[in-house]
Every structure is written in C-alpha cells, then in structure tokens.
C-alpha cells in the first residue's frame, strides 16, 4: 500500500492538467446519484478525491462502491482500506462481493472483469451514474489488445467515455488523462492507495503490454498513448455512423413486430451492410454477437440456401434460423418432450418451460373459445403427428401440418404450440384458431388464447 499524509485542501494547476474539479464537472451528466467504482488503486482514489471536493456542486448525491472479487489474499485488506478512506472523506460506502473465479479457458483477469461489471449492472440504481478511473493509457492498451486479437471497429473503439450500464450510465471521465498525470496528482496531494501485486505479473496480457511492450514503443514514438487513444476515438465515430446506417437498414428489412428480417430485402444490401445489419439486429435483440466466421456462415447458409431449407446457426446464448423469407434470432430453444401433458383452468398464465413459452387467456365477448365448454377439464398437449381439425368458419377438416404451413408457423415452433383438448377432442390451437363448434358467437363470453415465447432471463 502506498502511504502518505492526506493534504487538507485540493488544488490543481489547470493550465497544466485536466485533473480539475471544473473539468470533471463538465464531464458529468445530470443524475440523482453519482457513484465511484472504488478499487482502492491510485486511479479510482484520485477520482474519488476530486468528486469529494466537488460534492457541493453536484446535482445529486455522491457515494462509493467497492467490488470484492474474493480471489486474492489481500481482498479483505483492500475492502477495509476503501471503507476507511470513505469514512475519512465522509462518503457513503457500499460493498459488493462477487465470485470472480475463471472458467476453463478464461483468464483470471477476464473472469474478474466480467463478474465485476455484471454485479455493478445488476446493482446500479435507476438513472444513477457510475464513474470509473480508467485513463488514457488504459485506453491505448485496450486498443492494442483488441488489435492483436483481430478486432473490428467496435473492438478498436476500445472503451466508450459514456455508455449504458444496467438501469443507469457508466462514465469514464479520465480517458483524456495520462497515468503519469494521475500519479503526479496523487503524490502531490499525498493520497494513499493500494497496489495489486498481480499488476506486475506479465503472464497476463495487459501487464505484459504495460510493463514490456509499451515502454519500448514509447521510446520510439513519444506520446503514443495519446495518439492511440485518439485513434480509438476515430473508431468510435465510425461505429456511430455504422449504427446509424444499420438502424436505417433495419427499418427497411424488418418484416414484423417479432423483429424477423426479410431475406429478400437483405439480399439487396452489399455484404458489408449485411454484416453491419446482422450485428445490429442481434444486438437489439440482446443476444451475444457471433464471431466473424459465424457471421459469414449466417450469410452463406441463410441468404444463399434453398427457399424450402431450414438452416440453423448457433453459438453460446443465441441462434439464428430461417423460415421462408424470414430470418429469426432467439435464445436457444430448450429441450422439448411433446409427450408431456398439462391441466389448465385458464385463470392464470401457464408457464410451459420445456416448450419455451407461456400460455395465457384473455376474456373477450363474441369470439375466442366459448367459456362454458369443458370448464375445468382442459388438457394441454402437443402435436404427435396426424392431427386433423376443422377451424371455426371452415367447411372441412384439415391436417394440422397443412394448417401450420398455411399460417406460416416456423417449423421449429410447430411441435411446441399448445393444443387444447376437452374430453380427448381437439378444440383449439393456442395462438392460431378455435375449432368449429367451440367458438363463442354473438354476445357469448369467450377466451382469446395467446402463446408467446418465454421472456429472456
């Protein structure tokens, strides 16, 4: 831990540094609460000190949050240190404990970062602003790491200064400030901070870059950190333009409220715009983005395949399917047992987890399933094959398979659509039709049956 006696006042020569209260206040959007992600390190401590000085000028309250990853032996000491600093500054302190253990093939650094941001996103109060101490050198390192991994513009844009996080915003006000300037400020103002010993372990990519590669590069290209951070800003501008174009293409290619894309409309776009739109579409659906290889598989198999084919491209947490002219994105469908049966009284929505949806009923008049038919004796089943029915208003029985084709039901959904039975008679196909003789007419009370995908968890 770096120890020093705290100075009693805060002064910064604004002609030489952007580390001033005035500059920081210009960065802050209006919010009811401002939080500092306080690790105890020099960057977040400097940020906390500046905001503590500015607290009377803030439109909202100020507090600090510390994330204990419970990985290193010193974690408990760091937690105590952060709490002590906040007590001295009379700043409310909040603690989050997470399990940041790495999974197979994942680096400890990445695991800790993922766990930290997940916990912060889930916890952050509505409309609050969370500030972090990441600076210009961090930005330069992030850009280089992304470049070494072959990232596109999104990765090369590195860390945005202002972005959404959970129900609030994430702000990085130090991205124009160098590590050297922050250290100079901290020493001048006699701050005390903790040092993570793992920061010197060059087995980790970022540490290797920081300890060995960047110093060598900076000898040949002075000011490299500032230049790389500026390059990241240029990439961020390109991302904004690409997002604007994708939004326009989405409006032109989106077919329905379900958000599926028209294959024929996609084919009118250039390959670059197709890729751009597909990423945007998946992002809007809240799904993890695929690799470039998988993105090309989507283009090759979904856009160029036979019209009657039903291709599937999947990756962890997401899948893309095609039916006729529609491209559909979704979370992976759960395993389904079509032999399962359920009893339902219509009063409450029925969650059919294994079918991947929710069955519900809305009271209507003059339509839907007649209420007095088999009340309390409804069986919910699934297609076994060979079912036939006569939809209300039709003169003949039809195979359910043919009706699904007529209705445009995607083939992967057909075995999951709930079939409503009364005394072994098929009386309704949820979300599609009521059978002849079981529909409410004129002023009769009825039930409109809806079948919808399970909300994403």
Where are the predicted features?
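Core alpha/beta nucleotide-donor-binding catalytic domains of modification enzymes
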Residues: 10-215, 244
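Hydrophobic/aromatic-lined pockets within catalytic cores
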Residues: 148, 218, 282-286
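Non-catalytic, surface-exposed connector residues within folded enzymatic/regulatory domains
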Residues: 76, 106, 203, 207, ...
């Amino acid at each position: 831990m770096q120890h020093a006696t705290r100075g009693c006042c805060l002064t910064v020569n604004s002609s030489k540094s952007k580390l001033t209260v005035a500059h920081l206040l210009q960065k802050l959007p209006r919010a009811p609460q401002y939080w500092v992600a306080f690790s105890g390190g020099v960057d977040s401590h400097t940020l906390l000190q500046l905001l503590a000085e500015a607290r009377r000028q803030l439109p909202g309250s100020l507090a600090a949050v510390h994330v204990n990853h419970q990985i290193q032996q010193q974690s408990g000491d760091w937690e105590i240190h952060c709490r002590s600093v906040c007590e001295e500054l009379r700043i409310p302190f909040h603690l989050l404990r997470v399990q940041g253990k790495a999974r197979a093939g994942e680096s400890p650094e990445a695991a800790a970062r993922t766990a930290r941001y997940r916990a912060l996103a889930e916890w952050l109060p509505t409309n609050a602003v969370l500030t972090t101490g990441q600076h210009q050198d961090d930005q330069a390192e992030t850009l280089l790491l992304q470049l070494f991994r072959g990232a596109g513009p999104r990765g090369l844009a590195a860390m945005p200064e202002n972005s959404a996080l959970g129900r609030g915003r994430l702000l990085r006000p130090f991205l124009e400030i160098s590590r050297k300037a922050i250290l100079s400020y901290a020493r001048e103002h006699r701050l005390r901070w903790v040092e993570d010993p793992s920061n010197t372990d060059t087995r980790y990519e970022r540490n290797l870059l920081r300890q060995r590669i960047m110093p060598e590069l900076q000898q040949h290209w002075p000011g490299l950190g500032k230049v790389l951070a500026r390059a990241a800003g240029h990439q961020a501008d390109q991302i904004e333009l690409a997002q604007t174009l994708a939004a326009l293409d989405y409006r032109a290619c989106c077919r329905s409220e379900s958000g599926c894309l028209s294959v024929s409309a996609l084919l009118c776009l250039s390959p670059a715009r197709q890729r751009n739109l597909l990423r945007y579409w998946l992002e809007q659906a809240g799904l993890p983005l695929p690799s470039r290889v998988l993105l090309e598989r989507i283009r090759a198999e979904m856009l160029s395949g036979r019209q009657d084919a039903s291709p599937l491209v999947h990756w962890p947490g997401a899948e893309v399917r095609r039916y006729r002219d529609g491209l559909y994105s979704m979370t992976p469908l759960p395993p389904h047992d079509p032999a399962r049966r359920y009893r339902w009284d219509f009063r409450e929505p029925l969650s059919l987890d294994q079918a991947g949806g929710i069955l519900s009923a809305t009271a209507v008049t003059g339509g839907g399933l007649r209420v007095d038919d088999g009340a309390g004796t409804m069986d919910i089943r699934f297609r076994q094959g060979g079912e036939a029915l006569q939809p209300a208003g039709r003169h003949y029985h039809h195979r359910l398979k043919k009706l699904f084709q007529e209705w445009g039901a995607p083939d992967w959904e057909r075995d999951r659509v709930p079939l409503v039975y009364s005394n072994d008679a098929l009386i309704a196909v949820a979300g599609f039709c009521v059978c002849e003789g079981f529909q409410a007419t004129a002023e009769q009370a009825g039930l409109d049956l809806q079948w919808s995908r399970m909300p994403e968890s």
